[in-house]
């Protein structure tokens, strides 16, 4: 029998009636429906928000048959008996979906709101087309309550899509949308007495910038521990519900069951929405891997939003920090303003970064990439922004680097690195900002080596920004450590560490770059030897190649490099 996996299914009714596999999330629904009244949930795109809203709609429409054998079936009956009311009561449900609009067009928001109101008003014998959207919404809620004698349920899917699609693209239109949505959503507060339940979902929380400033009765559950598992798939849910699919994937990829499980975890797990919560798998990527029987990047098929890349560049943000060295407090995580200096909160809310550690005594969250799918997908989209690598060609360029290193072609490899660095835009930095220019060089080198980690084992070591090793190496501009391919952790060494290390089947390549222009290739080689960078690799029994490179500021590229084999 073919297992029906719900890839792309967003209708709870369709999912249940057509026999698709369903991971029961109705305990969360029951808890929400019987506690607070107006909720907001922020989760990354393709994380199951629309399906959960559809499930809420089915519950509040009293569609008992759809919940057969689920947690909610028994819980609703017991709760109703305890409260002395009828179970499965039907409420008027107003469902506003922003998913379908193309909001770069100036009339798109008006079209979406008008369609919603034009569709709902006739159900309650209303005709209010001459009024503003906010006033029409108010009249609709009041009429639904008065004509059914039931409080209204309001569900809003992707409330922020009009703002995200215009951010950094058309700021004038973005501000217009912001003002209109503020007025529209404020109705939820003014009509509080007519509302039984309201649930808004989105990617970001445009909190104190105005949208929700009037909606102060909103409960944000985005980082509440008890709702951390509401969207996405936990490890237990994966192994309980998808065991046959994991085995099929393993057989197709010539892996053992445990190897397939480990690969899925490495690629799609790692999202944490509370420091004490459980890690979550991206459901879209997980289901895609099972349906297509291949582990690869699915979530990044639409690419990284251009405004995020632009904001990171405008803020001169040091890209290696994103892999585990970002720190924010709770307010920083949950609010967002559309300026370059505040890019990190939206990177977290949109799923590009997640909680890696909570520093309790300082109340700080340490963030990093959740998994390989996000790490490589994000960095893949950044390389063209920091070099002249054409968009859509990152994979080809990285493939050439990998082929060179596998074939032992050090000169060809370094010529490619030289070309990447020399192509970096000058950005009109003044002499006072030479460090920012140097940072762009280092970012490009970091991106190349980090992206190679998909195919060969690489280590990109970055340490204290203010450290002085006497040679102006990459260690001056970064901190932390990211080891890609099969690991992502910080290692403590008794010996020193080089800027970059690449391991192939038979060779370890140790690189040291003098990117600030105050050291030669010979100086870099001397530093590798003097600081014992190769010591930790000698036990592998592989050939060890040392590569030192010197930078020339006048030509803004690598002037020279030297390579030599370490004698055993």
In which residue ranges do the predicted regions lie?
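Short beta-strand or tight-loop elements
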Residues: 441, 494-498, 542
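Conserved catalytic cores of phosphodiester-cleaving nucleases, focusing on short active-site segments
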Residues: 445, 470, 500-502, 506-517, ...
């Amino acid at each position: 029998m073919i297992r029906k996996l719900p890839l792309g299914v967003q209708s709870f009714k369709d999912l249940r009636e057509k026999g698709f596999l369903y991971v029961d999330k109705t305990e969360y629904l029951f808890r929400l429906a019987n506690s607070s009244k107006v909720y907001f949930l922020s989760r990354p795109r393709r994380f199951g928000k629309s399906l959960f809203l559809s499930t809420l709609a089915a519950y509040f429409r009293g569609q008992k048959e759809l919940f057969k054998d689920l947690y909610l079936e028994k819980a609703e009956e017991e709760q109703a008996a305890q409260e002395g009311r009828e179970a499965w009561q039907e409420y008027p449900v107003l469902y506003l979906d922003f998913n379908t609009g193309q909001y770069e067009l100036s009339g798109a928001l008006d079209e979406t709101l008008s369609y919603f109101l034009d569709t709902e008003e006739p159900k309650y014998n209303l005709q209010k087309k001459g009024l503003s959207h906010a006033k029409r919404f108010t009249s609709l809620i009041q009429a639904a309550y008065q004509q059914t004698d039931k409080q209204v349920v309001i569900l809003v899917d992707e409330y922020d899509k009009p703002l995200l699609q215009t951010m950094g693209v058309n700021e004038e239109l973005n501000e217009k949308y912001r003002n209109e949505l503020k007025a529209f959503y404020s109705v939820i507060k003014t009509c509080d007495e007519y509302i039984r339940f309201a649930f808004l979902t989105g990617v970001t929380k445009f909190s104190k910038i105005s949208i929700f400033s009037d909606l102060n009765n909103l409960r944000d559950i985005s980082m509440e521990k008890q709702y951390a598992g509401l969207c996405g798939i936990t490890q237990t849910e994966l192994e309980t519900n998808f065991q046959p699919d994991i085995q099929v994937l393993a057989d197709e990829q010539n892996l053992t069951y445990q190897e397939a499980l480990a690969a899925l975890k490495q690629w799609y797990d790692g999202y944490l929405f509370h420091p004490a919560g459980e890690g979550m798998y991206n459901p879209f990527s997980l289901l895609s891997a099972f349906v297509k029987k291949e582990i690869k990047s699915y979530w990044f098929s639409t690419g990284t939003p251009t405004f995020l890349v632009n904001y990171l560049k405008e803020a001169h943000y040091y890209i290696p920090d994103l892999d585990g060295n970002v720190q924010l407090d709770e307010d920083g995580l949950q609010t967002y303003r559309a300026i370059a200096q505040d890019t990190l909160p939206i990177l977290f809310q949109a799923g590009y970064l997640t909680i890696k550690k909570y520093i309790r005594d300082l109340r700080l969250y340490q963030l990093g990439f959740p998994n390989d799918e996000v790490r490589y997908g994000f960095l893949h989209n950044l390389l063209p922004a920091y070099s002249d690598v054409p968009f859509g060609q990152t994979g080809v360029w990285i493939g050439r680097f990998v082929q060179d290193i596998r074939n032992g072609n050090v000169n060809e490899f370094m010529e490619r690195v030289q070309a990447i660095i020399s192509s970096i835009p000058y950005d009109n930095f003044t002499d006072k900002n030479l460090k920012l220019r140097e940072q762009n060089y280092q970012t490009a080198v970091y991106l190349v080596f980090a992206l190679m980690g998909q195919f060969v084992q690489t280590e990109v070591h970055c340490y204290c920004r203010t450290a002085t090793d006497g040679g102006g190496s990459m260690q001056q501009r970064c901190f932390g450590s990211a080891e890609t391919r099969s690991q992502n952790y910080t290692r403590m060494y008794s010996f020193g560490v080089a800027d970059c290390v690449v391991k192939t089947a038979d060779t370890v390549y140790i690189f040291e770059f003098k990117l600030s222009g105050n050291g030669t290739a010979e100086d870099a080689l001397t530093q590798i030897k003097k600081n014992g960078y190769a010591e930790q690799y000698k036990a592998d029994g592989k050939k060890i190649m040392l590569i030192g490179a010197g930078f020339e500021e006048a030509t803004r590229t690598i002037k020279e490099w030297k390579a030599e084999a370490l004698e055993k």
